[in-house]
Amino acid sequence: MKVYQTNEIKNIALLGNDGSGKTTLTEALLYESGVIKRRGRITAKNTVSDYFPVEQEYGYSVFSTVFHVEWNGKKLNIIDCPGSDDFVGAAMTALNVTDTAILLLNGQYGPEVGTQNHFRYTEKLGKPVIFLVNQLDNEKCDYDQVLEQLKSIYGSKVVPVQYPIATGPNFNSLIDVLLMKKYSWGPDGGEPKIEDIPAEEMEKAKEWNKNLIEAAAEHDEGLMEKFFEKDSLTEDEMREGIRKGLASRGMFPVFCVCAGKDMGVRRLMEFLGNVVPFVSEMPKVHNTRGEVVEPDSNGPTSLYFFKTAVEPHIGDVQYFKVMSGKVHEGDDLTNADRGSKERMAQLFVCAGANRIKVEELCAGDIGCTVKLKDVRTGNTLNGKGAENRFNFIKYPNSKYSRAIKPLNEADTEKLMAVLNRMREEDPTWVIEQSKELRQTIVHGQGEFHLRTLKWRLENNEKLQIKYEEPKIPYRETITKAARADYRHKKQSGGAGQFGEVHLIVEPYYEGMPMPDTYKFNGQEFKINVKGTEEVPLEWGGKLVFVNSIVGGSIDARFMPAILKGIMSRMEQGPLTGSYARDVRVIVYDGKMHPVDSNEISFMLAGRNAFSEAFKNAGPKILEPIYDVEVFVPSDKMGDVMGDLQGRRAMIMGMSSESGYEKLVAKVPLKEMSSYSTALSSLTGGRASFIMKFASYELVPSDVQEKLMKEFESKQDKDE
């Protein structure tokens, strides 16, 4: 295969909602470019994309597919991404290593929730966007309505380059207002018949052509002057204007295809090859030090590894982008993230599961390799003279979590190893072994995300597992001061155990003054601080431990044991066994025995005195609250708001964004357990949401009472 230079390479992400036809379009692109001899079908399970068994089982893309096409001396690297928001990590990864995004739309639905989500990602990254309306042969397709929806959402930057003469089952022709030609196809699609525009379409075509010329001229001062002079531009001038408009996101061209019948695909590739910006024309990339890294094939070599796929009989197939320089088989490189040395194995360019061996890849190109010993997704490999490190991708917070356990306890270690390996394939997985909750928790993007994980574990790894509701990481605290004392005494012949601790607890906040007197039941307790220790708690908040012992009632050597006992109780709070936080403890008195006192005695005395005082100090349970943003169609706003209010949500605000209503709320984590499934059901899959931790807040009194009863009941059963 030819070695393509940087100025011959274009990298494109193919995005779209589930059902928009990305896999079918991929087949048509590969067929038209000669990479495959026959187009596969999803129902036949023989497509280049969706070749993993789990994808064929469910009929949906789960992983991104990297492929390339060669067209008129250009190489187009295209990454076909899953449409479901459950697999958003693949789309975000693809956008970070490509330069242009194609947003594919199902002609019968127009912009959907996936379109909105993907557009937001392109917006954040400043990537050019082409809208591509597919399935024009569907009887419910209304191209004009789709175009109006796009303009309503994204404004005047939406500029059509093509329009169908008719849609529905009889679709077989379109007008291209850049070339001012009619394209038509026979029943099998493929190579079009290109003709002059018929008279009945000429008026509309001229109007749309003028709109396109004006839009193209806006992005180049020289073109604008020519347009004012001649009221027109040549085809090449229009292409140049569109290229600049695309690159600056000042223009979003709209194209038409019927991928299932291979109509319009060849013309799309012509546009991609002729107009879409090259790697070298896009904004410069920066490394983690903020330095510009030029896509220069003559510079030092740097590779960014953005994807790992585990394939049977092969192992890890690792995909990379050449950020600078060139790479060859046998090159010695250094892992900037792990410090290890790597020798590059064979190099390939990709077409799904099929790979073509190449000798060299230049800056800007995308390829894959196998048998690297210590490379992870997100790592950078550098050649001599390069000291780059790239950290492009910030994945979204998890939205759906379940505790996971093997049905056979003996498989626990194997399960953890497999989960960690799978995280290399999909970094949006978060695997948490919670000491606090005593559960292994898998955090993902949705119910379907976890369903595919279960299928893969059971079918690929032969691991039988079950999901459970994850426990909620509640916290416990107090709202007023209280005191208690406790004597630990044990005598069983010989040396015994004795320790007595008197202490005060009170709620603590940063910068809180230290009183010198406390009063309980009419009795005053004067405090003479001898020492203070602030303990930052790994679960949040603080414990402030104050030594106020006077007269030597407790030796200083026993104070660490008292603190240890208190800490052990804070790790298992008295109300529900949850972590306690934000407490100040003042040890002001106690007793020792000259023979029987020891560390264990004072640890137990401190633990029990703290527990008793805590229960008398207005104890409260805190629950995690999350900031939630829901993107919902206007006609479903009332239903979604009502559902959130039923989840104890506090509605913080509403606004319009990208054609959808945005609802902002604070919601207890307990109420978000199956929200992704509920929201999909409520809106017919037309809404999406994001969530992130906000704070801990007091639970309502009825919820606290219920939680305490559940804990007491469990304690009774355990005993």
Annotate each PLM feature.
Residues M1-E719:
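Structural and coupling elements of P-loop NTPases
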